[in-house]
Amino acid sequence: MAMVNTTTRLSDDALAFLSERHLAMLTTLRADNSPHVVAVGFTFDPKTHIARVITTGGSQKAVNADRSGLAVLSQVDGARWLSLEGRAAVNSDIDAVRDAELRYAQRYRTPRPNPRRVVIEVQIERVLGSADLLDRA
């Protein structure tokens, strides 16, 4: 296992992995600090190091992310895996939600209409993963 902070660049293979159609597990913390883990689709912007998850406002993952301000996204495919850790914030701004929906549509499919949609934005601070996906140069 390798670990880097985001000042270390993800390899081209890692960026490709993060654009392939895979689901991930989103971990947030409940009020009692126990983990809440759910399967999600997400997108990652390598320029800003922001991962985005679209969800319904008031969902448990949104409530947890808003309260604790922490989240981890873990994606795995065979021996390849990455965990993206960082500060989470829930954004209900219509332009931010629209942008997140467009990004989601590029990676997965057009999301169904949802007037209560928000976006969980995770500012990635640390990356763990299989050594072949991390560039420590």
UniProtKB/Swiss-Prot annotation:
Binding site for coenzyme F420-(gamma-Glu)n: 36-41, 54-55, 60-61, 67, 78-81
Substitution effect: residue 108 to A: 44.5-fold decrease in catalytic efficiency
UniProt source species: Mycobacterium tuberculosis (strain ATCC 25618 / H37Rv)
Reactions mediated catalytically: (4Z,15Z)-bilirubin IXalpha + oxidized coenzyme F420-(gamma-L-Glu)(n) + H(+) = biliverdin IXalpha + reduced coenzyme F420-(gamma-L-Glu)(n)
Entry protein name: F420H(2)-dependent biliverdin reductase
Per UniProt, location of the Isoglutamyl lysine isopeptide (Lys-Gln) (interchain with Q-Cter in protein Pup) cross-link in this chain: 47
Coiled coil stretches, renumbered: none
Superkingdom: Bacteria
GO cellular component, one term: cell surface
Keywords, in A-Z order: Isopeptide bond, Oxidoreductase, Secreted, Ubl conjugation
Family according to the record: Belongs to the F420H(2)-dependent biliverdin reductase family.
Gene3D superfamilies for this protein: Electron Transport, Fmn-binding Protein, Chain A (2.30.110.10)
PANTHER family linked to this entry: F420H(2)-DEPENDENT BILIVERDIN REDUCTASE, HEME OXYGENASE HI_0854-RELATED
One Pfam family in the UniProt entry: PNPOx_N
Record localization: Cell surface; Secreted
